[in-house]
């Protein structure tokens, strides 16, 4: 099993302008309480997280309306590199004509962020459309977003909407060899939200029962 989730620490940098990640101490045994507790505050797009379609479309599905099994099943991890800030469709040129339903892109982000990586590699919408033509219905990246930091049109997000492709961002793929795996990605079961942090792991391909697509 390989954990591909980013560890959330007190200094974890969120998207500029988003609510910062923090855990406020609550009860403390050392202060005479019977338990230790904490109050969690964070953006819905902290660390490893999923984007529900409602994040980028007013008529898109909220997280609870997305079938959980779409985040579970066979995937392929591929190392890619950006050209002019975007991962081009040509990055898929050497891959099979038919791909697993889930494609995870290792763009070179480190395992841990000490500051927000503003120059991250985003995805060319043409890559998303080409991946969809090859059977991909979930695209993941180790970058904090599929679109550039300064994008206002969110072309990659809308290419995902157009092709019914789900989005998984902020993965930790630093130590993951390219190849096929079984993905288990479980977003927090939050209602009426545009996304949620998720715990994502990779298992050897074929670990999950047949039928977990």
Curated annotation (Swiss-Prot):
Enzyme class, spelled out: hydrolase
Function: Catalyzes the hydrolysis of N-formyl-L-kynurenine to L-kynurenine, the second step in the kynurenine pathway of tryptophan degradation.
Top-rank taxon: Bacteria
Protein name, per record: Kynurenine formamidase
InterPro entries: KFase/CYL (IPR007325), KFase_sf (IPR037175), Kynurenine_formamidase_bac (IPR017484)
Cofactor binding remark: Binds 2 zinc ions per subunit.
UniProt-annotated binding residues for substrate: 15
GO biological process: anthranilate metabolic process; L-tryptophan catabolic process to kynurenine
Keywords recorded for this protein, A-Z: Hydrolase, Metal-binding, Tryptophan catabolism, Zinc
Active site per UniProt: 55 (proton donor/acceptor)
Assembly and interaction partners: Homodimer.
Reaction catalysis annotation: N-formyl-L-kynurenine + H2O = L-kynurenine + formate + H(+)
Pathway involvement of the protein, from the record: Amino-acid degradation; L-tryptophan degradation via kynurenine pathway; L-kynurenine from L-tryptophan: step 2/2
